[in-house]
Amino acid sequence: MGSRASTLLRDEELEEIKKETGFSHSQITRLYSRFTSLDKGENGTLSREDFQRIPELAINPLGDRIINAFFPEGEDQVNFRGFMRTLAHFRPIEDNEKSKDVNGPEPLNSRSNKLHFAFRLYDLDKDDKISRDELLQVLRMMVGVNISDEQLGSIADRTIQEADQDGDSAISFTEFVKVLEKVDVEQKMSIRFLH
């Protein structure tokens, strides 16, 4: 230990974050070190600009949507705990977690929470539905100008037609889950964090 990261995180904070996110002590310490290196203002929070300096997010077509997921509504800064809560959605599900206490809170990295997180990336206006326009905006972010507007419109129309079960021309969370029921979301939405 003895690093700057370990001295600035109190043991009780470390335990609370471990319990809430499922990360190990060493993972939390390592991620705290990364957090402080990103904190250019050295004020214990990250801004959107701090995130935009991360090369992997800067080149990701959904980078802005992912960055926005770190910030609570109306906030322009995120503290370490909020940072860890968002990252926890991407923590792989370990074998020993599959038989967790059914009465306890659902882990942030559960299939359901990963699906909610993904759904929110598409639900731009936060009305609990993915409209054709929202789908078009996200598709445009992902493919850039490589596909014509007409082709994108066809993809969006077909996607909504296949997913929309109640005929409202939008995709609800329930319909989103149904479409992805055979997709290994747990694996596809996981990042390996060093121990």
UniProtKB/Swiss-Prot annotation:
Positions annotated to bind Ca(2+) 2: 164, 166, 168, 175
Lipidation (N-myristoyl glycine): 2
Annotated motif Nuclear export signal 1, positions: 138-147
GO BP terms: cellular response to acidic pH; cytoplasmic microtubule organization; membrane docking; membrane fusion; membrane organization; microtubule bundle formation; negative regulation of calcineurin-NFAT signaling cascade; negative regulation of NF-kappaB transcription factor activity
Principal location class: nucleus
SUPFAM superfamilies: EF-hand (SSF47473)
Subcellular location: Nucleus; Cytoplasm; Cytoplasm, Cytoskeleton; Endomembrane system
Assigned keywords, A-Z: Calcium, Cell membrane, Cytoplasm, Cytoskeleton, Endoplasmic reticulum, Lipoprotein, Membrane, Metal-binding, Myristate, Nucleus, Phosphoprotein, Protein kinase inhibitor, Protein transport, Repeat, Transport
GO cellular component assignments: cytoplasm; endoplasmic reticulum; endoplasmic reticulum-Golgi intermediate compartment; Golgi membrane; membrane raft; microtubule cytoskeleton; nucleus; plasma membrane
Lipid bilayer topology: Lipid-anchor
Keyword flag DNA-binding: no
The keyword Amino-acid biosynthesis is assigned to this record: no
Binding-site residues, Ca(2+) 1: 123, 125, 127, 129, 134
Top-rank taxon: Eukaryota
Record motif Nuclear export signal 2, residues: 176-185
InterPro entries: Calcineurin_B_homologous, EF-hand-dom_pair, EF_Hand_1_Ca_BS, EF_hand_dom
Post-translational modification: Phosphorylated; decreased phosphorylation is associated with an increase in SLC9A1/NHE1 Na(+)/H(+) exchange activity. Phosphorylation occurs in serum-dependent manner. The phosphorylation state may regulate the binding to SLC9A1/NHE1.
GO molecular function: calcium ion binding; calcium-dependent protein binding; kinase binding; microtubule binding; protein kinase inhibitor activity; sodium:proton antiporter activity
Name of a matching Pfam family: EF-hand_7
Residue span, EF-hand domain: 26-61, 66-101, 110-145, 151-186
Chain positions of motif Necessary for association with microtubule and interaction with GAPDH: 2-6
Gene3D superfamilies documented for this protein: EF-hand
Subunit structure of this chain's protein: Monomer. Interacts with STK17B; the interaction occurs in a calcium-independent manner and induces the translocation of CHP1 from the Golgi to the nucleus. Interacts with GAPDH; the interaction is direct, occurs in a N-myristoylation-dependent manner and facilitates the ability of CHP1 to bind microtubules. Interacts with KIF1B (via the C-terminal end of the kinesin-motor domain); the interaction occurs in a calcium-dependent manner.
Family classification: Belongs to the calcineurin regulatory subunit family. CHP subfamily.
Function: Calcium-binding protein involved in different processes such as regulation of vesicular trafficking, plasma membrane Na(+)/H(+) exchanger and gene transcription. Involved in the constitutive exocytic membrane traffic. Mediates the association between microtubules and membrane-bound organelles of the endoplasmic reticulum and Golgi apparatus and is also required for the targeting and fusion of transcytotic vesicles (TCV) with the plasma membrane. Functions as an integral cofactor in cell pH regulation by controlling plasma membrane-type Na(+)/H(+) exchange activity.
Protein name: Calcineurin B homologous protein 1
Organism expressing this protein natively: Bos taurus (Bovine)
Encoding gene (name): CHP1
